[in-house]
From Swiss-Prot:
Keywords: Ligase. It catalyses: 4-(trimethylamino)butanoate + ATP + CoA = 4-(trimethylamino)butanoyl-CoA + AMP + diphosphate; crotonobetaine + ATP + CoA = crotonobetainyl-CoA + AMP + diphosphate; (R)-carnitine + ATP + CoA = (R)-carnitinyl-CoA + AMP + diphosphate. Catalyzes the transfer of CoA to carnitine, generating the initial carnitinyl-CoA needed for the CaiB reaction cycle. Also has activity toward crotonobetaine and gamma-butyrobetaine. GO terms for molecular function: carnitine-CoA ligase activity; crotonobetaine-CoA ligase activity; medium-chain fatty acid-CoA ligase activity. The keyword Transmembrane helix does not apply. Pfam families: AMP-binding (PF00501), AMP-binding_C (PF13193). This is Crotonobetaine/carnitine--CoA ligase. Belongs to the ATP-dependent AMP-binding enzyme family. InterPro entries: AMP-bd_C, AMP-bd_C_sf, AMP-binding_CS, AMP-dep_synth/lig_dom, ANL_N_sf, CaiC. It comes from the Bacteria. GO terms for biological process: carnitine metabolic process; fatty acid metabolic process. Pathway: Amine and polyamine metabolism; carnitine metabolism.
Amino acid sequence: MDIIGGQHLRQMWDDLADVYGHKTALICESSGGVVNRYSYLELNQEINRTANLFYTLGIRKGDKVALHLDNCPEFIFCWFGLAKIGAIMVPINARLLREESAWILQNSQACLLVTSAQFYPMYQQIQQEDATQLRHICLTDVALPADDGVSSFTQLKNQQPATLCYAPPLSTDDTAEILFTSGTTSRPKGVVITHYNLRFAGYYSAWQCALRDDDVYLTVMPAFHIDCQCTAAMAAFSAGATFVLVEKYSARAFWGQVQKYRATITECIPMMIRTLMVQPPSANDRQHRLREVMFYLNLSEQEKDAFCERFGVRLLTSYGMTETIVGIIGDRPGDKRRWPSIGRAGFCYEAEIRDDHNRPLPAGEIGEICIKGVPGKTIFKEYFLNPKATAKVLEADGWLHTGDTGYCDEEGFFYFVDRRCNMIKRGGENVSCVELENIIATHPKIQDIVVVGIKDSIRDEAIKAFVVLNEGETLSEEEFFRFCEQNMAKFKVPSYLEIRKDLPRNCSGKIIRKNLK
C-alpha cells in the first residue's frame, strides 16, 4: 500500500505552505525562555533560504552535511533545507564528545558542519588532528572566530531569497538522512533513511495518535533522535498541526510548558515519567489539554496506572527503534489497553516471534521479535557502507531482526521481555533485566534502577542492581534485599547493590549498561 503518492519532502513543504499558510507550524522554546514562532508559510521560506545557503556553499544532491545542535529552529531549517536540494542530513548527538563525533564525521563522509559556538573548539581540534572530509563550518551563534572556513549560519541565511534557487530532480527513494544509532553496545551504525521513510513516518505516526490539524504536539526529545523526528515532528507537519520543540527537559517546567502552549499530544521516556511523578502534587496536575502521551519502554503496570490516574492522560505504547523508523507495535487509536502488552502491529507491518533457527513460534512462547516491512519505505533502507551489518539484521524479503525477546498471545498482542543482550544467565536460568527492574522500581524509595550481569566464577553471572533514590531517602542493603526476596524468585534476587546519584544514559534516555559492567 503506497500512501505517499510519489511526494518527496520538497513537495511536502511547498504543499503545506500553500494549504496552511499563516497557521502556526513551529514553536521553539530555548532553555533561556526565548520563544520563536513560524507559520507554515514562514517556515517554508526559512527552509528555502537555508537550502539556498547550502547551495552557495557548494552543497549539491547527495552531499552529506552534519548537524551538531541542541533543539533549535536551525535544526528544522537545515533538516528540510538539505532535503529540498537532495542533500543528506547527518545529525550528531549533541552530548557526544570529541572521539565519537570525529568517528561519525569520518564514517558519514560529511563535508560541511552546522553547529554552535560551544561545540566549535572540539570541531576545530578534529579538523586539525583527524582525517575527515569536513571543509567548512557554519556557526549558528552571532559571534564568529577569526578562522578561515567558518561562517555565520544566520547571516548567510538571511542574505538568501525566500524562493528555492536549486531544485534537482528528487525521488522518494533518495536518501534524506543518515542517523547513527546510539551505540550502547558497539560502534554506532549509520541508518539510511529515505524521503519515503520520513513521509510514511509522518502519516503513520499521525494515525497512531489520531492527530488533527488543530492539535499541538509538544516534545522535549532531542531533535537528532528518531523519536523527535518521526514520531513527533513529521506527524505534526503531515497533519498540518503545530509542533512545539522545547530545548531541554525539565520536570519542574514540563507541565507549565504543556499548559502554556495548550499541547494536546506529547511523548515521554520512562525517565521523564518517573521524574514527573516525584514532583510535589499540585492542584494543576490535571489542568491541561493533553489527551495522549506516547511512551517508550520500559514502565511497570503500577507506574503506568499511577501516571494516568494522577495526570488524567492516556498512555499509548510505542515500540520501535531507529531501524523501524516509527513505533511499529503499539496501542492503536481507540483500542483498550492490555498492559503489560506493548500492543499490536500497526498498518503496513507484520510481526512475529521466531526461535534461534529463524522459525516462527506459537503464541505464548518466548523468542525474538521480528518485523516485516519494506526497506527504504516502511523500515530503514540499509546501514551506510556496511552491507555485512545490514545482512545480519535485514532479510532480503524485508524481515527485520530486532534483537529483542518477547512473545505474542492468541489475539496478536505482543509482550516485550528484554533485549537479548540484557538477559542474564545465572546458574542455568535466564533472568530478564527488565523484569527485575520493573519489580524493583515499585519500591517507594527508588527513583531509577538498572540491573546488569557481572562475571561470577560459580554461576556464570551474578546480578547487580544500581539504584537512584528519591530525594532525601536512604535505603539499607538489608531493606533492599528483603524487598527483593519478597517480590521475586530466589534465583532472581540481586547479589549486589550500588546506590548512585545518577545513571549513565545515551541521547534517547536509554541506560548505557556497558558503563556499569
